[in-house]
Every structure is written in C-alpha cells, then in structure tokens.
Amino acid sequence: MTNRVDHPAGGYKKLFESTEELVAPVTAQVTGRIPVWLSGSLLRCGPGLFEVGSEQFYHLFDGQALLHKFEFKGGHVIYHRRFIRTDTYVRAMTEKRIVITEFGTFAFPDPCKNIFSRFLSYFQGLEVTDNALVNVYPVGEDYYACTETNYITKINPETLETVKKVDLCNYVSINGVTAHPHIEHDGTVYNIGNCFGKHFAFAYNIVKIPPLQADKEDPINKAKVVVQFPCSERFKPSYVHSFGLTPNYIVFVEQPVKINLFKFLSSWSIWGANYMDCFESHETMGVWMHVAEKHTGEYLNIKYRTSAFNLFHHINTYEDHGFLIVDLCCWKGFEFVYNYLYLANLRENWEEVKRSAEKPPQPEVRRYVLPLDIHKVDTGKNLVNLPYTTATAVLRSDETIWLEPEVLFSGPRQAFEFPQINYKKHGGKDYTYAYGVGLNHFVPDRLSKLNVKTKETWVWQEPDTYPSEPIFVSQPDAIEEDDGVVLSVVISPGEGQKPAFLLILNAKDMSEIARAEVDSNIPVTFHGMFKKA
C-alpha cells in the first residue's frame, strides 16, 4: 500500500474537467463477468461543471452537482448522469455566471445592477448554496442529494430528475447538517450539525428522522433533535463532516478547525467572502471528544482530550466491555487540510503537486479508545485494558482523560481516505475490514483494503488510473464479513483506453472481477451508495 507511483503525465487533471450530462442512458462495455446476484444501482455525487460562462470555480467543493448512476441489469451495466437542478445551478445557467457563493468561490453581484443596487444586495441576507454535490442517501422511500448546508435535494433515483428542494431549518433547529448521516436497519436517520444553543452560544445538535410509518407521512416532518453537544468556543463552532454511532452511544469529535461567526457575518455582508475565508485554526485547542447516550439523549460529562488533528471521515465506532473504539482517518495537525484543495493546486504538474503536499497535516488511520466508566480510578494510570490495542486513555489531575491512539496505517503523504465498511452488518459493531481510496499527495491512485486487527493491506492499482470511493456490496448469502464486491468509478486518461470505467473487485483480495467502460470522461465523485433492485 505504501509503494509510491509517480504521475508525470498529469492524467489526474481529468478529474477536474467539466463535462456534459447525458441526454439518455448509455450501455457500458463489460469485460469480465459481473456476478449474477449483483442487481441494483450505484449512485454517485460530485462536481461536473467547474466554470460558468467566463467565471471559474476555485475550490474542489465548488463545482455544480452532477448525479451519476450505474445500473446493473442481467450482466449489463447502464450508465446515466444528470446535473441536479438546484436553485444554484438553474440560476447560474440562466444568468450565465456564478450567482450563489460556494465553498471557496465568492459570487459577485450582478454586474448589470447599478452601484446602489449592488451595495444593497450585500445587506439583503445570506444566500446559502444548495449545490448538492457531496453525497446521496435515503430517507424513508425517498432519496436526497446533499452538501453540508441546511438544504437537501430530493431526486428520482430511477430517472435522476430533480424533485424538490428541502430546507431542514423548517423542521429542526439546525444551521446545516453533514453529508454523512447514519442510516439504521429500520431506516432511522441520524445526523449532526451546529445550531444556536443556550444563551445564544453555538452547540451541536443530533437530529433524528424516524423511518417511514404506516401513515406514509414524510419522515422529515417528524424530525427532532435528540442530543445537544456543547461547543468549546461560544461563537466559533468546529467544522464537522461526520460522527460516530453505536447501538447505545453517539460520538462527536470536535476538531481545532473553527468557523469564525463574526468573520462569517461581517465579511460576507460587507466586503464579500466565501466559506473558506471564514475558517481559522485553533493552535492550542487540540481535539475534544464528546459522548452522549443515544436512547436517553444524556450528555456524558467526560472530558476526553488529545492532540490536534483534522478529521473528515469516521471509519467505524463500536462498544467493547465499557469502552468505545473509535477508528478515524486523521490528518495530523491543526491547519485546515481544505486549504490545499483549491483546483489550481490540484491541477498543477506532478512535481508541484508533490511539493505542495509536503506542507499540510499528514494522514494517518488511528484508533482511539474511550473509557466509559472512570469511577474509582487512579490519576495517571492507563484506563484501557483491552488486550488487542495499544491505544491509551490516562486520567489527569484536571479530570480530563488524555487519549493516545493506536496507528492502524501510516505512510508519508499516503492517505487511506473515503473509508467504507460492510456497514449493514458491522456499522457500529466490531469489525475487521475497511476499504478506502489511497491518496498519493492528494491524487487518488489506488484502492485499498485494511484489516484493522492485523494492519494487513491489499491493493488494487493500475498505471495512470484514478479511482473513487470504494463501495462495498455484500453477497445475498454472505457468511463472512468480506463476502461481496467493491465498486469504484475510475478514470483512465491514458492512450488506448476508454476515458472511464466502473470497476468491480472481489472484496476478499481486491482482485478484478469485471469492468464496465464508458466513452466519456467522468469527473471526480465524492460519495454515494448502492441501491439494491
């Protein structure tokens, strides 16, 4: 997994090229044999348009949302894609310019307005983007594409048509939610986002959306806040991209990447800024971990602390004999990793990409162990007595518990990211295997399987190919955890190859079973899901 491959041809730049949606689905060219039991659709979200008219988007998370679908039918694969008709997209296409500010791109006022109208537009309230480019997930019988604001977009998973925009602020107290909700077996949805808590201070709310009931009412109408976590700084909430969930507990990791509320409100309304302009790093905070009981909503007033890291993706969290095991894809340090994900950086030639990747926090897969019972223990002693981990938790004299992790994978500028597991059977439970994209200086150039118990790895990699997040699909008659396949969208810009393909791997050993090639480039996709037929 740590074997380094160079990319002097710069084929990875094709990940960040605009494309067009398809008028109609196309049949992919299959080599190999697709398992007969594999029936359903892989849905993926990502940016598909990196400029509007003469105006460029600047950040990886700015491009207009493109929804992809690979449908498996009787050994064939049908590919389709459509732009999501968000308000952001429709207005941009109508006005032929960037109309709503994105994560790293400020939308300038309409140049056709006079100077007085443009001045007033700064004070007419913040227009929040609904550009749903990050993920897609089910709620009841419906499917929603999402970003990380208060807006989610209902889509038709069969036709990829956009159905409607939903503002979650109309249902719960939330400023925005993550693109990584947890979905339980019965369809219950849990998510987290920041909110205004007591005394106008920021807090973090856990939102619960129940499964579809016999009355067939939209489950979102019944959404409610079930847990509230405190914020370490009153007016500076941390950036949160995911969280941990077990059958009995919710885990929230508060990282030192902060949103400065005053900067957010003043800069946006007075001189114009984007979301990235409002982040700042807290150099001395480290990381705070919070735990709450899932069923009662009780916040456990245990002060877990550790050294600084960036966190975007939880791998899995589970309970074991009075401990919570929390496995994370970490980036070591307090500086915001997203500072290095501007498109100009990602499109550089290979040597410059490598130089740039030397600067940000470096990646590491870590296991933290959080003790839940800390009564009658001695200060200064390690509270972790599980035989299979070297992670420690030490009670300090100030009543904080200092956590040191066990490192499950580490390689210089070699990340294991966009993790997936056999979620249906092992989400929130003890598990053995995780699947991820291998990032080589931020360039995705391999797919990896990690045994979190032995640290053994398996890798799929081909020259000049760039895969996406691996999605695990279990066999219907699976006995073992890794009985199934791994799906990934891969671009292949090399000569003599089709521009892109859907890769199907044996989840046991990461060997190729089949691929389904298409005749058009597929830009980078972030997250998605497999919808069974």
Curated annotation (Swiss-Prot):
UniProt KW Acetylation keyword: yes
A single GO BP: retinoid metabolic process
Chief location: cytoplasm
Enzyme Commission identifier(s): 3.1.1.64, 5.3.3.22
Protein origin, superkingdom: Eukaryota
Cofactor note: Binds 1 Fe(2+) ion per subunit.
Residue list for modification N-acetylthreonine: 2
Lipidation feature positions (S-palmitoyl cysteine): 112, 231, 329-330
Compartments in which it is found: Cytoplasm; Cell membrane; Microsome membrane
Sorted UniProt keywords: Acetylation, Cell membrane, Cytoplasm, Endoplasmic reticulum, Hydrolase, Iron, Isomerase, Lipid metabolism, Lipoprotein, Membrane, Metal-binding, Microsome, Palmitate, Phosphoprotein, Sensory transduction, Vision
Membrane protein topology class: Lipid-anchor
Tissue note: Retinal pigment epithelium and single cone cells but not in isolated rods.
Cofactor requirement: Fe(2+)
Positions of Fe cation binding: 180, 241, 313, 527
Molecular function terms from GO: all-trans-retinyl-ester hydrolase, 11-cis retinol forming activity; all-trans-retinyl-palmitate hydrolase, 11-cis retinol forming activity; beta-carotene 15,15'-dioxygenase activity; cardiolipin binding; isomerase activity; metal ion binding; phosphatidylcholine binding; phosphatidylserine binding
Keyword Secreted annotated: no
Any one of the GO CC terms: membrane
Catalytic activity: an all-trans-retinyl ester + H2O = 11-cis-retinol + a fatty acid + H(+); lutein = (3R,3'S)-zeaxanthin; all-trans-retinyl hexadecanoate + H2O = 11-cis-retinol + hexadecanoate + H(+)
PTM note: Palmitoylation by LRAT regulates ligand binding specificity; the palmitoylated form (membrane form) specifically binds all-trans-retinyl-palmitate, while the soluble unpalmitoylated form binds all-trans-retinol (vitamin A).
InterPro entries, per database record: Carotenoid_Oase
Task of the protein: Critical isomerohydrolase in the retinoid cycle involved in regeneration of 11-cis-retinal, the chromophore of rod and cone opsins. Catalyzes the cleavage and isomerization of all-trans-retinyl fatty acid esters to 11-cis-retinol which is further oxidized by 11-cis retinol dehydrogenase to 11-cis-retinal for use as visual chromophore. Essential for the production of 11-cis retinal for both rod and cone photoreceptors. Also capable of catalyzing the isomerization of lutein to meso-zeaxanthin an eye-specific carotenoid.
Family of this protein: Belongs to the carotenoid oxygenase family.
Annotated PANTHER family: BETA-CAROTENE DIOXYGENASE (PTHR10543), RETINOID ISOMEROHYDROLASE (PTHR10543:SF57)
Stated name of the protein: Retinoid isomerohydrolase
Species this chain originates from: Ambystoma tigrinum
Gene coding for it: RPE65
